[in-house]
Amino acid sequence: MPAKPEAAVITHPLVVKAAAEYALEKGGIVKISDSPAIGLFAKILKDGGYRKAFEGLDVDFKEFKTSVKIDIGKPFGFIDIAKDALEADAVINIAKLKTHAQMFLTLGVKNLFGCIVGLRKPEWHLRSGIDREMFARLLVRIHRAVSPHVTIVDGILGMEGQGPGKGGAPRRLGVLAGGSSAFAVDVAICRMLGADPDRLPTNKAARELELTDYNVDVIGDYEGINNFVFPIQDPLTFGPRPLHRILRKHLVQRPAADKNLCKLCGECWKYCPAEAISHDKEKVSFDYDKCIRCYCCIEVCPEGALKAVETFPGKIIRRLLLTH
């Protein structure tokens, strides 16, 4: 989404520039691509400082628009992945270190969801529904299909709190991590932040598929980050199956709008995969029975007007669990 680098929503252009300069020095033809869920690609490049940062460099900014159907295996079957990403001689995957209310963190593996073209992303959110683990397995399969040669995660200025959109808080972490394995990079960053690697669903999915064993060799400075603020997360399903919907509705944190910030731009209801958002001339409204808690609306809100909030019963139960 369109954002300035200091918001810590997008990868900083100078990190991407450094990778591009290296590739150019090695004789590469460099294309910088993405498929934004929201906003014009040109506006993202302008607002994010990419156009200015890359002045004078022989690179091509090219939005992913054409897909190729790839069979990524059961239960997903065929998925449309950006043709340019699949046909490139080498893919350098450059992600932002930021929190994610649904998937815990956005790191190297999840970043490749950007290779799903445009509005096909909500379709896969909806197909995965409330199953966080299934969505993680989807992301791991996409990673395997794209098979990046190098993954870099920009955490020089990262995001903590209720990310991944403007509801999160920028924090200077001074972290720049990279490696030939996105799984290894993600595991190392989790440990650096003080989190068990299994808390990141894509790590767990990759381990179950025997794509990583969490044994990571780290070269360079590796100091832990103190007091990193992770997103509040609730299990999306719990209790007896017949009660899943009602328990999720009343206990799991939900997206909510700040009327003072909301400009009724329409991005949230246009992008909502579950079609759970409606609006009138004064406000947006949420159907929490339909809402799958993917928090896409929060991520795409250009005003930072949407946040994940705890329900009152959810707060009570969380406090009881913390005191026992």
For every predicted segment, state its role.
Residues M1-K259, K263, W269-K283, Y288, ...:
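N-terminal and secondary-structure boundary signal
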Residues I292-R293:
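Extended, alpha-helix-rich binding/interface surfaces that flank or overlap catalytic cores
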